[in-house]
Curated annotation (Swiss-Prot):
Name of the gene this protein is made from: LAX2
Record GO cellular component, one term: plasma membrane
Lineage: Eukaryota, Viridiplantae, Streptophyta, Embryophyta, Tracheophyta
Protein name: Auxin transporter-like protein 2
Membrane topology annotation: Multi-pass membrane protein
Glycosylation sites: 223, 297
Ranges per topology, Cytoplasmic: 1-59, 101-135, 194-196, 254-266, 336-356, 400-425
């Protein structure tokens, strides 16, 4: 990647004149230089491939380990069909977000607004296109979702490392990994995740195929049963976890803004989802085939596979990847916080890192309160992802282009596979109604019922969620028995 191309391209100027302004917080303007730089190669990303790696890596994090649990709640057929269904819906709404970003950016650039040293975020797109009420709605849902998305990564870290070293309980591991993940405050923006995104996707690819192959080699457990959906509450809990799986694009706008040519993002999320299918469907299917209903009480797939070097390797790689995903989820929160306290245009990485630290503290605390790995995914999916990722983008697109003049002057016309504005409206309306009723309604009821059951069973601040009880020590003989 040549440094002179590291400036973002202005969207307005016929989509072809390069704007050499960075538009990225905390970075100096690049000097035109044709020499190869290792720093640029590893640190400064903004290509289509960088965006693809970021989307795929962020989408397929710890959910790999909970999807077999969801299959045990849904049954094999429903599990596969819902993955495909929500994968398509998620790709469509990511496309809508990219269209709205381009529309917002093009309107602002026509007004000569300069985005140098400012990262555009989703709530700002909503504000610019639909007004302050939509800004508040987007800010509330997006920030809350990203907050709990970060919480889930911390919980997953503690859950996974426990299967390598159970000398410490999961709560203690949460303390340790909270401190480790706090180091993400030093990563300025999504430009700087190039090498991490690449490594992260490699790690999850290894883990997915480890789960698949290890389950097949293990074979079916003795007396395994596959009863499938037995209760509505379990069915909708599992369905909502899959909705959550393919709703990882709360950071879409930030990833787009980190691209040199953001208008090329349109189909990147779909391409990422197609790759993710090759990881999630085989692994979840194989683990469920091997262990069946036993997964209902084991939300982490690692817990049922035999301990060996291959499993330990997968655990370690997932831990590193969860650190990366924590950074993905937290970085937009860092940006929001910087804007609130007036530090967003600060050049010093150290000053910005110091300013960002307060964001990590509530995440750490919530991970200790709600350590329910698995059930918390479904709750977040139903209550937050349903709005953040599916309902709000679909409704926002419908309202942005409700007038004929807006459709006529749209920066992005309807896609080639759906060239009619009417068809787009119908599909968007279907998504809003479906996700509102099935995802938020039934999914919210089921996931919260299950979540409350976990609280009743294990309590808040559970020291070691779903850990095996310690072996009962044999009772010592009574003192008089020792004197025969």
């Amino acid at each position: 990647m040549l440094p002179q191309k590291q400036g973002e391209e202005a969207i307005v100027s016929s989509f072809n004149e390069t704007d050499q302004q960075e538009g990225v917080v905390g970075r100096e303007e690049e000097v035109e230089d044709h020499s190869f730089s290792v720093k640029n190669f590893l640190w400064h990303g903004g290509s289509v491939w960088d965006a693809w790696f970021s989307c795929a890596s962020n989408q397929v994090a710890q959910v790999l380990l909970t999807l077999p649990y969801s299959f045990s709640q849904l049954g094999m057929l429903s599990g596969i069909l819902l993955q495909v269904f929500y994968g398509i819906l998620g790709s469509w709404t990511a496309y809508l977000i990219s269209v709205l970003y381009v529309e917002y950016r093009s309107r602002k650039e026509k007004e000569n607004v300069n985005f140098k040293n400012h990262v555009i975020q989703w709530f700002e797109v909503l504000d610019g296109l639909l007004g302050p009420y939509w800004k508040a709605l987007g800010l509330a849902f997006n920030c809350t979702f990203l907050l709990f998305g970060s919480v889930i990564q911390l919980i997953a870290c503690a859950s996974n490392i426990y299967y390598i070293n159970d000398n410490l309980d999961k709560r203690t591991w949460t303390y340790i990994f909270g401190a480790c993940c706090a180091t993400t405050v030093f990563i300025p923006s999504f430009h700087n995740y190039r090498i991490w995104s690449f490594l992260g996707l490699g790690m999850t690819t290894y883990t997915a195929w480890y789960l698949t192959i290890a389950s097949i080699v293990h074979g079916q457990a003795e007396n395994v049963t596959h009863t499938g959906p037995k209760k509505l509450v379990l069915y909708f809990t599992g369905a909502t976890n899959i909705l959550y799986t393919f709703g990882g694009h709360a950071v879409t706008v930030e990833i787009m803004h980190a691209m040199w040519k953001p208008q090329k993002f349109k189909y990147i999320y779909l391409m990422a989802t197609l790759y993710v299918f090759t990881l999630t469907i085989p692994s979840a299917t194989a683990v469920y085939w091997a262990f069946g209903d036993e997964l209902l009480n084991h939300s982490n797939a690692f817990s049922l596979l035999p301990k060996n070097g291959w499993r330990d390797g997968a655990v370690i790689l997932m831990l590193i990847h969860q650190f990366i995903t924590f950074g993905f989820a937290c970085t937009p929160l860092y940006f929001v916080w910087e804007k609130v306290i007036g530090m967003h245009d600060t050049r010093s990485i150290c000053l910005r890192a110091l300013a960002r630290l307060p964001v990590v503290i509530p995440i750490w605390f919530l991970a200790i309160i709600f350590p329910f790995f698995g059930p918390i995914n479904s709750a977040v999916g139903a209550l937050l992802v349903s709005f953040t990722v599916y309902i709000i983008p679909s409704a926002a697109h419908m309202l942005t282009y409700r007038k004929a003049s807006a459709r006529k002057n749209a920066a992005e016309k309807p896609p080639f596979f759906m060239p009619s504005w009417t068809a787009m409206y119908i599909f968007n309306a279907f998504i809003v109604i479906w996700v509102l009723v099935v995802g938020f309604g039934f999914g919210g009821w089921a996931s919260m019922t299950n979540f409350i059951r976990q609280i009743d069973t294990f309590g808040l601040f559970a020291k070691c969620y779903q850990c095996k009880p310690p072996p009962v020590m044999a009772a010592a003989p009574p003192p008089h028995a020792l004197h025969h």
